[in-house]
Amino acid sequence: MKLSALHQSYLNRRSNSFRSPTSLDSSVDGSGKSLIAVFWLILHCLCCLISLVLGFRFSRLVFFFLFSTSSTNLYSLPFRPDLPVKHLDVHTIGRTLDPGANGTTVVATATKSSRVVVGRHGIRIRPWPHPNPVEVMKAHQIIGRVQKEQKMIFGMKSSKMVIAVTPTYVRTFQALHLTGVMHSLMLVPYDLVWIVVEAGGATNETGLIIAKSGLRTIHVGIDQRMPNTWEDRSKLEVFMRLQALRVVREEKLDGIVMFADDSNMHSMELFDEIQNVKWFGTVSVGILAHSGNAEEMVLSMEKRKEMEKEEEEESSSLPVQGPACNSTDQLIGWHIFNTLPYAGKSAVYIDDVAAVLPQKLEWSGFVLNSRLLWEEAENKPEWVKDFGSLNENEGVESPLSLLKDPSMVEPLGSCGRQVLLWWLRVEARADSKFPPGWIIDPPLEITVAAKRTPWPDVPPEPPTKKKDQMPLSQGNTVVVIPKQQQHPTKIRKPKRKSKKSKHEPRPTDTTTQVYSSSSKHQERN
């Protein structure tokens, strides 16, 4: 009994030892199954989301194919002759203006939009959405007001008047050049006075051109005529500019003086930049040296390479005249246009077919405060010469002659890094013809008649003659030949030349015929 009891207890302990690891395995399996279940749940949700998106997209395509193929013919072959050709009807929008109490209202009526098929997808053509013009004008006024407020906050607090000096004279391109400068000055948002100095005396032709601007203008004339050489012309233009500065001194015009030559091109940023000058400033000028002969300006590749090598050895020069600054934006020198490549090839006379070169320092690149020219001005700097005692015959070449210390010049335009105007001289031949003021009076004659347009002043048709008479005119004389004496026109046939034909006398015709240049012309017509 004891042995059986011991054996039974041993078996029970052994069974318990085998059951304990199974319980541990069951706990581990339970946790693993929970993680797998969560993973499959997440994967199932992700697949459902993907199927939902793809199904929505597929449903849109199916809906598009089912309900829009009949109207758009997406998969119709472009060259099938059995299909009818459909034309696109372009519908216009009817606009009716109804005057109201507050303004004009626009009533737009649009027709049904059509479709155009390009590739696989159809394009719906919708009517153009015409906005209400009253609302558009209000929007423009709001934008203009905002820009004005921004300029008042971030721009110049107090703007100065601009005094533009332009030397000119009557020539073929005067209307062309003055019109360009005039429209540039008309766009200036500041008060402006335009002083025009004319060589050869003030003329009505120049006065009519500058009167169209609507600006405050001062027209001054000098007795000297413009010479026909570029060197003498530049000297006379200096004299004309000094005369304009004397007008500023006498009238005590308060503002910024700039030298706007009639053939120069100005950027609108220039007029904003010169507002920053205190006494005497300078800007960079782009030099456009040109030649009327294109063959001379087109150089071979070898010559260009040689010139590039020479420029690299000496110094690379750009066609710019203006101030040179250091890293601290302080004036240390000047950029001058290099005239060495044009040595011996520059124009001497105004109508020469050659490159026109500028002076060492052009006046158009300088601006100054008009108070420097006054006799008595507050806080006038000491490094400025007295303009009243300046002798014009001393050789005033540039505005730097007005200063005692040229280092006090203020560089403008990001210290000369911005080119704000361009210097160019383009003139016609001295003997070129042009109508005064470019006004065609009397009208020009017709050179080539337009199609389906009769010639003016058509001469009347001649009176009908009798059947047995045919008139032939010689100048103002008319000779009538009876019809019996007329010879029918025969078609000449080529005949062989023979020696006998040369010696045979030709039969003389008793009928007298009169030929003249006018009669031949009538017969040809």
Curated annotation (Swiss-Prot):
Where does this protein come from, organism-wise?
Arabidopsis thaliana (Mouse-ear cress)
- Record's protein name: Beta-1,4-xylosyltransferase IRX14
Q: Which residues form a coiled coil?
A: none
GO annotation (BP), single: fruit development
Q: Do you know which SUPFAM superfamilies this protein is assigned to?
A: Nucleotide-diphospho-sugar transferases (SSF53448)
Q: Where is the composition biased (Basic residues)?
A: 489-503
Q: Which lineage do the record's taxonomy fields give for this organism?
A: Eukaryota, Viridiplantae, Streptophyta, Embryophyta, Tracheophyta
* Gene Ontology terms: cellular component: endosome; Golgi apparatus; Golgi membrane; Golgi trans cisterna; trans-Golgi network
Q: Which InterPro entries match?
A: Glyco_trans_43, Nucleotide-diphossugar_trans
The principal location of this protein is: Golgi
Keyword terms: Cell wall biogenesis/degradation, Glycoprotein, Glycosyltransferase, Golgi apparatus, Membrane, Signal-anchor, Transferase, Transmembrane, Transmembrane helix
Q: Which reaction does it catalyse?
A: [(1->4)-beta-D-xylan](n) + UDP-alpha-D-xylose = [(1->4)-beta-D-xylan](n+1) + UDP + H(+)
